[in-house]
Amino acid sequence: MISLVFGDALARSFPFGSRTRNVNDLGNQFVPYHAHLWDMLHGEADGDVLVNWQSGYGSSFLPDLGTYLTSPFAVLVGLFPRDEIDLAVYVISVLKIATAGAVMAWLLRTVRTGPWWVAGALGASYALCGWTLATAVYNPMWLDGLIALPLLCLVGEWALARRRTITGALLVAVAWMANFYTAYMATIGAALFVIARLVIDRPAHVVTAVSGPPRGSTRTAANAERETAAEHPATEPATAADDAGPDDVGSDRGTPTVGLAGSPASAPRPSVPRLLGELWRPLVTLLLGVGLAAPLVSVIYAGTGEAYPGRDTEFVAEPWQDVFARLLPGGYGYNSPSLYVDTVALLLALTLPFNTAVPRRVRYGWSALVVAVLLSFQWKPTHLAWHAFTTPNGSQFRQTFVLCALLVIAAWLSLAYARPTWRALLGGGGVLAALTLTARDSQLLYAWSVPIMLAGAATLALALALWRFADARRRPVLVVLAAVLLVGMQVGQSAATLAVSDRKRLAHMDDYAPWGERQREQRAAIQAVDGWPAYRTEPGRQQTVGNDPMMVGGQGAQYYSSLTSDVLSRTMTALGGGWTSGGRSVQSLDNPVTDVIFSVGARLYSPPDPHQRWNPRHPGPVVTVRQKVPPLVTVRPPGPRPAYGISAYRNQELLLGARVYDVPSYTLHLTDRPQLPRTRDGGYRVPARHRAADPTAQVKAVCRPGSSVFLWAPRYWGKADLRDGRGPQADFRGDYPPKRSAAMQELGRTPANGQVRITLTALRGGSVPKGAIGCLDRGKLKAAADRLTDRGATEVSVDGATVRATVRAGSRGTAVVAMPNIKGWECAAGGSARPATSYLGLVSVPLDGKATTVSCTFQPPGLRGGAAAAGLALLGLVSIGAWRAWRARQTGRAPAGHPSTSAASHD
């Protein structure tokens, strides 16, 4: 924790300075989701655990809850004032990192006994690894995987010891529910750990259980384990004699060898296949735990199937010089594996192959495992296996914390058997020097990375010398000095590495302001006019983050999630909406037609966010505009179901049920060029304007005087303003190929002469499609809205995940609920419920003229199957508990010394 605080203070990062922490997903997703959780805990949210009514005009929330908010630490957000939401997320992140270090220290002491302060220091090395400092610190949900890995390794240890099956299964369930994505990677890492323990370390209790007690002995595996534990508490006994090399036998540096029955040859050594046969025990524990987590995991899995596909990414291996550079302090790279563990831990790990006090099988086996895992990062098939067979967008080495854990375990093994000699230190130092030499030309290193690494190596050598001298002279104060040196170097290196990461992230990632006066003003304005479910209140087009409705309130179209539904993204795109992040960050659409369609009765207009450097500086108050709109449930007349076309204007009219736009033909040319290249759909390609002297593009069209002029140009990046239209200059940010899409925007009113003249200042260029200009007749729109109101529901109520509406008697046609038809909605109109039908992407219910009520209830896909799996897992755990209770009673009745006497608690 000291390293984290010190590093953030060095970088002058929140909460210790003026620099924001909220980069990328931390600002866009994690802080807003925690704000929504705060609202839920305090009864102020619109929705429940199944439906979030504030985002995406109604989105499935349980998959988001499982993805972002089911960590046991997340509920701590409710203890903070809502205005301190950023501080709450920061404190939660720090607590997660500290917990990960503590659990790793526990695991190390379980693997083998050793000084508690060294275990604590190496636990901190793991918790403050490069993956944490460079990647996970702004993805707080991934920090649960940092805790899960050593926790699952402990569960594996218990399973091999035939202990704590129920506790282990419950901890597996907690880990998988906290964040299943990193728990999946942690499970792979824990599986490698358990296999290594069986094949390399061969724990005494497992060997005894597989081989049986020595001939003539009446001891059971459980008794052997208890006797061994009494001699060597909190660890497995050493087995160095079995595998000692010529220089190991008789050495006084290692822990004395204790056989399974008190002598080295008390039992025959089992074969590797027989040892691996014991894997069924941790496997059963894992399956029971994942089964308990199935209701959440299955919902998330189903949600990914319904999500907008986003962008395809191809895996590219990183240059080895950059990979090795990330082992050193101060290295930073967005898409390279963050392998840093402080130099103390790294050098100790590198001494393992050279530490002759460690049995050959242990030092070579664990070293080979570390190398194999590192190689798996750079090979596409194993890369895909690590990432659930999908190359992620963004960082492609999200499993790096597993390798950091293995490095720390290797460091512990090298020190726990016996402190490395000078020969081992020189061997490890030689490997470190070779790695540093390979990485010398990497652009990911700071100038001081190598000097601070050398300082760390020198500190370790000095601390080990002091420690050895203290043991020889019996001066414990020198041990304290050695500990202070080691821990001080760790704190300094990790703090410096974090400070570098904090600053470099801000240089190449989008960043967002923490909660401040802007959000307070918006939230107060929304609370003053909020009328849900009679109408929606839109937080507005000028967004602060990608999830403004969850941050400041209201019920908008804006929604950013890894699980943004395909139907929402495609529906809003068809209506002229904009998005970023490959379609998964849907933006608000400021349009009077869609406001009528989605029952938006109040809309906020805020000045551009001053935190973003590209925004114009137009300070001013937050303005709320009210309008009368149809209810949430409206009725369309009988007829064939319409289908969307190419034009966003015509698509809006289809959903509205009335013609309200004129879509004139137009011409577009540069001031010095009469002709521009055309697109295949009949539009124009607009070249980028690189200099102020470059020509602008002019658009000419004719519209009805007084009509509202809109421009729909999803692939255009630049500015647009309507001459004599008295409207503001509009910014468009659309890419091609489409990583983002620009939203349709209003430019102003058509002048009295009907001549529409639009100036395009192309910053990056792009294209303008055929039918890009729409001229809205507001009188026709009002008439259409009145008709929808007259035919719409007379009463609408929303209770959690259920919408109920009363429609007029004799209503025929289709009841349309103004929310996206995400999979899971079931509706009824006077009859039994059945899956909702789709009306241009919205939930709809057929009306036959007899029904007067319509009700729709949401149940996330995958919940039923997950609940069934959880029921079976729970039945399995209850059966195990009952069987243990029966065995305990039977054991209590058995005569003393009878062979059936065994520890039931170990079965």
Language model: regions and residue ranges:
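Membrane-interface coil-to-helix junctions
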Residues: S3-M104, A124, C129-I147, A317-R326, ...
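Periplasmic/ER-lumenal interhelical loops and adjacent helix-loop junctions
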Residues: Q29, P213, E278-G365, A372-V373, ...
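Active-site-proximal, structured, solvent-exposed surfaces of multi-pass membrane proteins
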Residues: F30, R680-D907
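Membrane-embedded helix bundles of polyisoprenyl
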Residues: I97-V111, W116-D201, E278-I300
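Membrane-interfacial loop-to-transmembrane alpha-helix junctions, especially the N-terminal start
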Residues: G114-A121, E157-W158, R163-G168, E278, ...
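Perimembrane helix-loop-helix junctions
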Residues: W158, A186-L286, L460-A465
